[in-house]
């Protein structure tokens, strides 16, 4: 089959290959007949990048492809490849032997009969063996893009002929010597999937299991027949309305690793498709073997033109949402489980070990709370806690932030692994949206609530507003709102309300209490500003 090998073959690129070395590198089939050779120089195969946000164009070559992203491609043949040549009687003849030169960069094919059987300028085709997937024997006019495919090696296109690769060319009789020369032009298009996972803790612990591509629109292709049997006329590829509906192709993979950046060597996966202008839905399935959790990422690419003989690099960032569970005692220098992350429980109402117990024993993780006296402003002193909302700002978020509750039974990253969590949370208006909608300045938002006769809650306890019931309708948009997950809290190392209730510190102690600090609290049925003990472990976060 035609070999699309990935990687640079140094010996093949040398311009100083001696005759002896050439002989050593030849793979020869001893048969008699007419020689059709591809001894023209390596052709340039253009490549293009298809990122999730981008689409491109490019150009291509003669035989098969040694592909390096960003550097085009080279060409090579394999020992089981064959070609078709049309003789003077209009009959297609299949080659009966092949001799490889220069590691496959050149090849001599043996055709049956004599040179006089073939016209100068006769047509040559390559169709591989893909049609056998549909139960047919290879012909010069049939190919297939198998609906179900598998790969055993990353960064390898050595079975392109089984996946639908095809091409054609014109053979010329060289100086009436009886030996014909041809250059093959590829007529299929090629996708090279290059996924990554940008979470450095998670990437080493997950594997790429499957890629599924669905054609949702095609300009010249009936996408119901995107896969399986197609007709090839030497120039164009046409779907044949195969009776099996097949708008998608699935590639199963043997646990390819993922890295934080593109790693062609370790996980590049190739696919052959019919040229056209498409909309694609591409689904990548990854698995964490430790937790046995799988998740699928879906990327949609629209209006992408795939031209004949061109390679398109398709990148994708397969990074799931992270819980980022950094609970703090109020005004602590470090988070609750700092240095003891592996002790942090994930199951609700279970207790972890090595939680902070006193300022003397855990000066980094324990609260810096000091009560200055009643009705005296008590601001956080650590640099991080100075950046989180103060209590007045939190009132605006809670009572004028138009909260929307959502529940996501989804997959998250937690401490370098995938976990399945039934996670609730709320969407709130961003500060800029609140100020615009309420007609207030940032200074007003910082110094009191409500707008009329405001109370500065840092020093005074005013009239508490009624709890807000969050909407369960979809959030109007995600550009003017931001999301807060319900990550629960810790008391004495015990996790509580994980996934069902959210607690977020403010930067102010409550002026009416010896040991309480203001916080935002929410569930599916209420949103409020309240207060809790400084020794609780809840989330501290800079709000948008």
Where are these regions (language model features)?
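Sec-type signal peptide cleavage vicinity
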Residues: 1-399, 405-408, 422
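C-terminal, surface-exposed recognition/capping segments
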Residues: 421-544
């Amino acid at each position: 089959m035609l070999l699309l090998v990935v990687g640079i073959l140094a010996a093949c690129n040398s311009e100083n290959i001696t005759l002896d070395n050439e002989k050593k590198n030849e793979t020869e089939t001893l048969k008699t007949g007419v020689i059709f050779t591809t001894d023209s120089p390596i052709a340039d195969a253009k490549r293009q990048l298809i990122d999730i946000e981008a689409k491109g164009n490019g150009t291509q070559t003669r035989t098969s492809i040694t592909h390096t992203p960003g550097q085009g491609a080279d060409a090579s043949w394999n020992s089981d490849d064959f070609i078709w040549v049309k003789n003077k009687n209009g009959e297609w003849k299949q080659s009966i032997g092949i001799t490889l030169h220069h590691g496959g960069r050149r090849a001599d094919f043996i055709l049956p009969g004599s040179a006089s059987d073939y016209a100068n300028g006769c047509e040559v085709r390559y169709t591989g063996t893909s049609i056998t997937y549909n139960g047919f024997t290879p012909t010069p006019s049939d190919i297939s893009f198998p609906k179900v495919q598998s790969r055993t090696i990353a960064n390898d296109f050595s079975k392109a002929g089984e996946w639908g690769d095809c091409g054609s060319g014109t053979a010329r009789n060289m100086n009436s010597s009886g030996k014909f020369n041809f250059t093959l032009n590829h007529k299929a298009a090629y996708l090279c999937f290059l996924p990554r996972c940008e979470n450095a803790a998670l990437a080493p612990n997950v594997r790429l299991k499957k890629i599924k591509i669905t054609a949702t629109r095609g300009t010249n292709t009936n996408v119901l027949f995107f896969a399986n049997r197609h007709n090839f006329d030497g120039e164009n590829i046409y779907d044949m309305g195969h009776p099996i509906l097949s708008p998608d192709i699935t590639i199963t993979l043997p646990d390819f690793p993922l890295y934080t950046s593109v790693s062609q060597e370790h996980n590049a996966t190739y696919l052959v498709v019919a040229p056209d202008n498409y909309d694609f839905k591409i689904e990548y399935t990854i698995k964490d073997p430790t937790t046995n959790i799988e998740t699928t990422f879906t990327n949609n690419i629209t209006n992408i033109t795939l031209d004949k003989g061109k390679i398109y690099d398709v990148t994708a960032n397969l990074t799931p949402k992270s819980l980022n569970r950094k609970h703090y005692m109020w005004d602590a220098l470090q988070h609750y489980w700092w240095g003891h992350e592996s002790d942090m429980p994930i199951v609700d109402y279970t207790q972890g070990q090595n939680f902070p117990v006193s300022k003397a024993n855990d000066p980094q993780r324990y609260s810096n709370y000091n009560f200055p006296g009643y009705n005296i402003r008590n601001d956080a002193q650590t640099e991080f806690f100075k950046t989180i909302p103060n209590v007045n700002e939190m009132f605006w978020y809670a009572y004028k932030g138009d909260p929307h509750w959502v529940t996501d039974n989804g997959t998250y990253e937690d401490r370098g692994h995938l976990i399945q969590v039934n996670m609730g949370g709320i969407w709130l208006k961003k500060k800029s949206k609140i100020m615009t909608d309420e007609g207030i300045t940032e200074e007003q938002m910082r110094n009191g609530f409500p707008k009329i006769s405001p109370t500065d809650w840092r020093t005074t306890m005013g009239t508490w507003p009624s709890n807000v019931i969050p909407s369960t309708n979809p959030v109007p948009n995600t550009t003017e709102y931001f999301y807060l997950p319900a990550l629960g809290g810790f008391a004495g190392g015990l996790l509580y309300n994980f996934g069902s209730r959210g607690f977020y510190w403010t930067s102010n102690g409550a002026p009416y209490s010896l040991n309480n600090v203001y916080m935002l609290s929410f569930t599916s049925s209420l949103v409020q500003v309240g207060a809790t003990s400084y020794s609780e472990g809840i989330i501290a976060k800079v709000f948008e």
